[in-house]
């Protein structure tokens, strides 16, 4: 017999913001598994189609933009995930989008785009007639982050 539970709010007994879910012998924390930021951003039109926990986006240059969070992260050890698609070009295959890393002669001299209040992203061509590795604006930059909020 199927059951249905209708509630407006779940609250943990020992910790209000922490709820464990058990499936078989595996237990996972519900809050830790939820995306804390989600965005579908059109860099060509400079418009946000859909978002969660995003206060703004700055279009820095071709294939380079910064997402500013409404609620900050606790640290820079969160996990971003992304995908990109350029509808407006014939080079639809092989696009990339990921965390921006500036060049430097050593790993310590490089700058990574992970910040507690924002995330800097690059998009471009992975392999195409327009140039492998070239930065380019994409119609659909979909980015999500997982990790604790401050």
Predicted regions and their residues:
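Intrinsic-disorder/low-complexity peptide segments enriched for small residues
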Residues: 3, 28, 83, 112, ...
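Extracellular receptor-binding modules and their adjoining Ser/Thr/Gly/Asp/Asn-rich linkers
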Residues: 3-4, 9-75, 133-150
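Intrinsic-disorder/low-complexity loop/linker signature
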Residues: 25, 83, 105-107
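Extracellular jelly-roll beta-sandwich "head" domains, especially the C-terminal globular C1q domain
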Residues: 89-150
């Amino acid at each position: 017999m199927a059951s249905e539970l209708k509630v407006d709010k779940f609250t943990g007994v020992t910790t209000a913001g922490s709820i464990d879910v058990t499936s078989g012998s595996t237990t996972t924390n519900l809050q830790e598994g939820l995306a804390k930021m989600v965005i579908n951003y059109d860099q060509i039109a400079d418009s946000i189609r859909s978002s969660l926990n995003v206060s703004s986006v700055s279009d820095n240059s071709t294939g380079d933009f910064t997402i500013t969070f409404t609620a900050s992260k606790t640290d820079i050890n969160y996990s971003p995930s992304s995908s990109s698609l350029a509808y407006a070009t014939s080079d639809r295959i092989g696009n990339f989008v990921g965390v921006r890393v500036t060049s430097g002669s050593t790993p310590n001299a490089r700058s990574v785009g992970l910040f507690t209040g924002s995330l800097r992203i690059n998009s471009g061509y992975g392999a195409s007639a327009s140039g492998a590795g070239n930065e380019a604006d994409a119609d659909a930059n979909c980015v999500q982050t997982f990790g604790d909020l401050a």
